[in-house]
Design a protein with these regions (language model features):
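Residue at a conserved register position within TPR or TPR-like alpha-solenoid repeats
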Residues: 1, 35-38, 76
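Alpha-helical junction/boundary sensor with strong preference for TPR arrays
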Residues: 21, 51, 55-59, 95-103
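Residue-level detector of the short coil/turn that links helix A to helix B
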Residues: 5, 39-42, 80
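"A position-specific structural signal for the A-helix of alpha-solenoid helical repeats
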Residues: 30-34, 64, 71, 78, ...
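Single-residue signature of alpha-solenoid repeat helices
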Residues: 10, 44-47, 85
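Alpha-solenoid helical repeat scaffolds
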Residues: 15, 49-52, 90
Length: 124
């Protein structure tokens, strides 16, 4: 639906699916990602909430847990809150220096790099 330009319909359908399948990780993650890929603060705020829920449902330090942490940081970055995004990454990195390893680690570090110039500018 999204590819066909029917994003609103896709959001509505996934919202319904999340209610019908509250324990289906694939459905929950797909909906959270759809919201995170949105274009406005309303979507990003909803995505932040969904990724927090996904984090709570996942095993600590699992790939899903790291993905949820990263996605929360992305949501904060999109919402114009680079300090909060950086804080999530730094706290996670303090406890788990490898940040999930591989691609996830690279994504975390790239997002942190993008947050830092905004922090310096915002503090001037």
């Amino acid at each position: 639906l999204v590819a066909a330009g029917q994003r609103a319909e896709a959001v509505a359908k996934y919202e319904q699916l999340t209610k019908e399948h509250p324990n289906d990780e694939r459905v929950q993650v797909a909906y959270a990602q759809l919201l995170l890929d949105g274009t406005d603060a309303k979507d990003w705020q909803a995505a932040l909430s969904r990724w927090r829920q996904n984090e709570k449902k996942s095993r600590r330090a699992s790939t899903m847990w790291f993905r949820a942490k990263y996605s929360q940081a992305v949501a904060h970055h999109k919402l114009g809150e680079p300090a909060q995004a950086a804080k999530i990454i730094r706290v996670t990195q303090t406890i788990y220096p490898e940040l999930g390893g591989g691609q996830l680690q690279m994504q975390f570090l790239e997002l942190l790099r993008r947050c830092e110039p905004r922090l310096r500018t915002d503090q001037m």
